[in-house]
C-alpha cells in the first residue's frame, strides 16, 4: 500500500473541499494518485469537479498593448508586491508591452534582444533590477492578430494582477472589453464547447455516469441526467455557455450576438500562475540571520 503523506491529504482537501478522513481514504484507495482520487470522490458524490487553480506566488504585473491589427499581452515579474505597485515598475511593464507589440518577436529570448533607446530590452531589465533592487524579468507574452472587421478588447484587473486580451468579430470595442472583463472574473478555459478536447469531455461523461450510478438512479434516466450535468460542465469551462457577468439573463454568446458579433479568441494572464514560491521556514530564517 502506498504511503500517503499529510501534504497529499492537504492538497486533495484544497482541491475538493472534502474532510481529512475522506481525503485520506480516497488517496489510499487509488494508491496516492491525485487525479484518480479526485475522480473517486466525485464518483461517490463527495466532491465537485476540482478546479485546477495553480497557486499564485510570484509578484509582478501583466499588461496589454495594441498596435493596429496586432496586440500583445505580457507578464513581467518582480520579487515583491511592494515593487509591483511602484510607478517606475508599472511604466516599465507598459513600455515592454509597447515594444513587443511594435516588433512582434517570436519568443522571450528574441524579445530580450529587441533594440530600444537604452540598448536592448534585456539591458533595460538589468538596469531596472539594479535601480529597484529586485530581480525584474519578462516571464511570457503572446502576440494576437485580428482581421479588419474584428475588435480587440483589453481589460486589466487590480492594476494588472490579471490581464485579458479578447478578439470579437463584428461587435464593437466596448463589447470586446466587456468580454475581456468577464474572462478576467470567471476564468473560462475555452471559447466554446467545440474547443473542449474530446478526451476531456469523455472523461467528464464517464465520471458523471459513475456518479449517477452510485446515486442509485435507474439506467433509463442516467443518460438524461448525464446530459444535463454535462451542460453544467460546459458552462464552467466554455465562455460562450457562461452567464454573462453584467447580465446573467444572457449567456456570453447571446450577449455578443445581440451586438452583432461573436467571440473569436481570448488570452488571460494571472500574475504568477503556475509558479511555486519558495516557502521559507521563519525560525530557520531568524537563526540564519543571527549566526
Swiss-Prot record:
The lineage of its organism: Bacteria, Bacillati, Bacillota, Bacilli, Lactobacillales. Residues 80-83 are annotated as: Involved in Mg(2+) ion dislocation from EF-Tu. The gene is tsf. Associates with the EF-Tu.GDP complex and induces the exchange of GDP to GTP. It remains bound to the aminoacyl-tRNA.EF-Tu.GTP complex up to the GTP hydrolysis stage on the ribosome. One of its GO terms (cellular component) is cytoplasm. It is found in: Cytoplasm. Keywords: Cytoplasm, Elongation factor, Protein biosynthesis. Its main location: cytoplasm. It comes from Ligilactobacillus salivarius (strain UCC118). Belongs to the EF-Ts family. One of its GO terms (molecular function) is translation elongation factor activity. HAMAP family: EF_Ts. Pfam families: EF_TS (PF00889). Gene3D superfamilies: 1.10.286.20, DNA helicase RuvA subunit, C-terminal domain, Elongation factor Ts, dimerisation domain. SUPFAM superfamilies: Elongation factor Ts (EF-Ts), dimerisation domain (SSF54713), UBA-like (SSF46934). PROSITE patterns: EF_TS_1, EF_TS_2. This is Elongation factor Ts.
Amino acid at each position: 500500500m502506498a504511503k500517503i503523506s499529510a501534504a497529499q491529504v492537504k492538497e486533495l482537501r484544497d482541491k475538493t473541499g472534502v474532510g481529512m478522513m475522506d481525503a485520506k481514504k480516497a488517496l489510499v484507495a487509488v494508491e496516492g494518485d491525485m487525479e484518480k482520487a479526485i475522480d473517486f470522490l466525485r464518483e461517490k458524490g463527495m466532491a465537485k469537479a476540482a478546479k485546477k487553480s495553480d497557486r499564485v506566488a510570484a509578484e509582478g504585473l501583466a499588461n496589454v498593448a495594441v498596435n493596429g491589427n496586432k496586440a500583445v499581452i505580457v507578464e513581467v515579474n518582480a520579487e515583491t508586491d511592494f515593487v509591483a505597485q511602484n510607478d517606475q515598475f508599472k511604466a516599465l511593464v507598459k513600455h515592454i508591452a509597447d515594444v513587443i507589440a511594435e516588433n512582434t518577436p517570436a519568443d522571450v529570448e528574441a524579445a530580450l534582444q529587441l533594440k530600444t533607446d537604452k540598448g536592448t530590452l534585456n539591458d533595460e531589465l538589468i538596469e531596472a533590477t539594479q535601480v529597484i533592487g529586485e530581480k525584474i524579468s519578462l516571464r511570457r507574452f503572446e502576440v494576437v492578430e485580428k482581421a479588419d472587421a474584428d475588435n480587440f478588447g483589453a481589460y486589466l484587473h487590480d492594476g494588472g494582477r490579471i490581464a485579458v486580451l479578447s478578439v470579437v468579430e463584428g461587435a464593437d470595442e466596448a463589447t470586446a472589453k466587456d468580454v475581456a472583463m468577464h474572462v478576467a472574473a470567471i476564468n473560462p478555459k475555452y471559447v466554446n464547447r467545440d474547443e473542449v478536447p474530446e478526451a476531456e469531455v469523455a472523461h467528464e461523461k464517464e465520471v458523471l455516469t459513475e456518479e449517477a450510478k452510485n446515486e442509485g438512479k435507474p439506467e433509463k434516466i442516467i443518460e438524461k441526467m448525464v446530459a444535463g450535468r454535462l451542460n453544467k460542465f460546459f458552462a464552467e469551462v466554455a465562455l460562450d455557455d457562461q452567464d454573462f457577468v453584467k447580465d446573467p439573463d444572457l449567456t456570453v454568446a447571446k450577449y455578443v450576438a445581440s451586438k452583432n458579433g461573436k467571440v473569436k479568441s481570448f488570452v488571460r494572464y494571472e500574475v504568477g500562475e503556475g509558479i511555486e514560491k519558495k516557502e521559507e521556514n521563519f525560525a530557520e530564517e531568524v537563526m540564519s540571520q543571527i549566526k
